[in-house]
Amino acid sequence: MSNTRTVHSSTSISKMNSALQISCLLVVLGCLLGSGHCQSEAEFAAKSREIAQVFGNPSVDKYTKARNLPTLIAFYEKYSSRLRLTPQERISINNAMRQYKAQRNQQVDGVSAQGGWLSDIIKTAISIIVKAVE
C-alpha cells in the first residue's frame, strides 16, 4: 500500500474556506428572509382581522373606533403596499391621514386636543381600508 499525501497550498485552503463561509452565509440569509416573509404574512393577516373586527363591525361604538384610529393608521402605514387600492383611493386615504395627524398635532394651552369627531373624509378612508382587508 502506498501512502500518498495530498498537499494543499494555504491559498487554496483559504479560498475554499471563504467559499464555504459565503455559501453558509447565503443559506442562513435565505432561511431568515423566508421565515421573515412568513411571519410578516401571518402578522398582516392577524392585523387585517383585527382592523376588520373593529372598523368593519357596525355594532362597535364610535368611541372604540376613535380609540383604535392610531392602530388603523399604523396598519395602513406599514401595509399600504399590500392593500389592493386604486390610485384615487390611495390619495383619499393619504389626505385623510394627513388631516387626522394635523388635527391630533394641534395643541390647546400646550396640551394635545382631546376628543373630537371623525370627519367624513376619515370615515371614507376607514371604509376603504376595511373593504381592502376583508
From Swiss-Prot:
Signal peptide as annotated in the record: 1-38
Keywords: Immunity, Innate immunity, Secreted, Signal
Induction details: By a variety of stressful conditions including bacterial infection, heat shock and exposure to ultraviolet light.
Subcellular location as annotated: Secreted
GO process annotations (BP): cellular response to heat; cellular response to UV; innate immune response; response to bacterium; response to heat
Pfam families: Turandot
A Gene Ontology term for the protein's cellular component: extracellular region
Predominant cellular place of this UniProt entry's protein: secreted
Function (record text): A humoral factor that may play a role in stress tolerance.
Family: Belongs to the Turandot family.
Name of the protein: Protein Turandot E
Gene: TotE
